[in-house]
Amino acid sequence: SEYARMYEGKVVLRFDDTDTKVKPPLPDAYEWIEEEYEWLAGKTADVVIKASERMPIYLEYAERMIVDGHGYVCCCSAEEFRGYRENTASCPCRSKSASESLTDWKSMNDGQMAEGEAVVRVKTDMSLPNPALRDWPALRIQHTPHPVAGDLYKVWPLLDFQSAIEDREQGVTHIIRGKDLMDSTRKQTLLYDHFGWDYPESLYWGRVKVHEFGGFSTSGMRSSIESGEHEGWGDLRLPTLRALRRRGFSARSIRDFWIGLGLTQKDISIPMQTVESFNASLIDSSAERRS
């Protein structure tokens, strides 16, 4: 939001919620996140996008990619394709005609194929130095109902495909992401090349570790909450906005902390005391003093 304010841009708050099986979205989280963003930024997001509500767009682009010969339906097992990829060899499915892949595509969407039986791949170059970029998977079959969208769709996009299409749809000019997602930039650039699009400017940040919390992830915290180890997302032992609010942190102090770190690819490790000092400084500056 700070960059949007500085350069008169707009903030797109997007829920990349197309994984129905491994990391299904929490229905309550949509409202929570919007509320927490408004608290932290001091304003609502300019645009709010739920990917699960925009499935027809992603499926249309996937079909267009297949028709144009830039993608195909792969029926190899994960193990079989791994072997082809490691040996820089094309799998048999790669030579399918567009009409053959479209027939399989229809079967995928009609629910006639089981999970894992087929995926849609972006056709790149199987001799690329980076194995992760070789004919990477864009969409897969998921029969597990979506917590919000239900069982309307049988084929769901993976994050790299979905977010790339949505960035284009929303006119995104700058992407700020963790440096661990550099391969996502490389994959999406190849996809954009297929469609004849210019890829947005990409900026990266390094990992920020707070000593007292150690290593943590959203999925790890969710697991600990579901197991009863933590008492919800506002548990004071968790590094969430909800918990920090309960501990008395102001939104401005958190913003000042992150702005102070700056946008750098360097990994940073700090004590919680550093974060607390920003909050204490604001409290001290606004405290009423009597002589």
Identify what each model region corresponds to.
Residues 9-13, 41-42, 164-172, 220-221, ...:
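Short acidic (Asp/Glu) and glycine-rich catalytic loops that position anionic groups and cofactors
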Residues 29-54, 61:
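A glycine-rich helix N-cap at a beta->alpha junction
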